[in-house]
Structure formats: C-alpha cells, structure tokens
Amino acid sequence: MKKTMLLNAQLSRCIASVGHTESLTICDAGLPIPLSVERIDLALTAGVPSFLQTLNVVTNEMYVERVVIAEEIKEKNPEILTALLTQLQQLESHQGNQIQVEFVSHETFKKFTLESKAIVRTGECSPYANVILYSGVPF
C-alpha cells in the first residue's frame, strides 16, 4: 500500500503520467466534462470530497508551474478563490517556485479543459470552484 497521501489508483496513475506543461483539471460537481477527456469522478455526495481537499491532495503529488482559473470566481465565489490562492502561495513556498496564475472567462476555461490529461470531478457544490493545473518539473 502507498505511503503517500493519495490513495486513488486512477488519479495516482494520471498524475504520474502528466508531463511538463501538460494539465490536470480539478472541478466542482457541475462542470461539463468533455467525452474526449478522461473523467476521474471522486464525487460521493454534495461537498464530499471538497474542491479544496482534492486540490491539497493533488498538489502534494504534482509539481505545478501554472494554473488557470475562471474569472467569474472573483465575483461568484470569493471565499473559495481566497482559499485557492492561499493554497497556491503555500505550494510556491514548498516547491520553491513561482506559480503563474491566469484568469480567463468560464467559456475559455471550458475550452482549455479539452487539452487536460484528465478532469477530476469533486463533490464541491459551489460556483466556479475549478482550476486547471499545469505540470512543471522539480529540477
């Protein structure tokens, strides 16, 4: 059995296969997931697991150099945005790098998900709780 935080085999395999500049999306329960992209559905019930819990576990396993967030989160879900940006600052400190944060429209965000290696669906039921993580290299 693995000793690290992430126990989900499908998600663990996916993170291990993500190469430099490739992306992984973590989303709320409502984001449409294109049929052409692998779906890793973790949602059990409303709020379980949460977006922030899932982000924390994934970023403990994945080196991140860039993120994309929907602009609409600023107005519609500022609490999640604040917590997300705080987690990213902590991740920068842990990784020793600066993470580029880019805001785009929700429509553009959905188009970007088409290029993700996989989309991880959480049980989060708050608006615009979505992020695209782009892999960096730890060397």
UniProtKB/Swiss-Prot annotation:
EC number(s) recorded for this UniProt protein: 5.4.99.62
GO molecular function, one term: monosaccharide binding
Active site: H20 (proton donor)
Reactions accelerated catalytically: beta-D-ribopyranose = beta-D-ribofuranose
Keyword Lipid biosynthesis: no
A GO term from the CC aspect: cytosol
InterPro entries for this protein: D-ribose_pyranase, RbsD-like_sf, RbsD_FucU
Family: Belongs to the RbsD / FucU family. RbsD subfamily.
Protein name stated in the entry: D-ribose pyranase
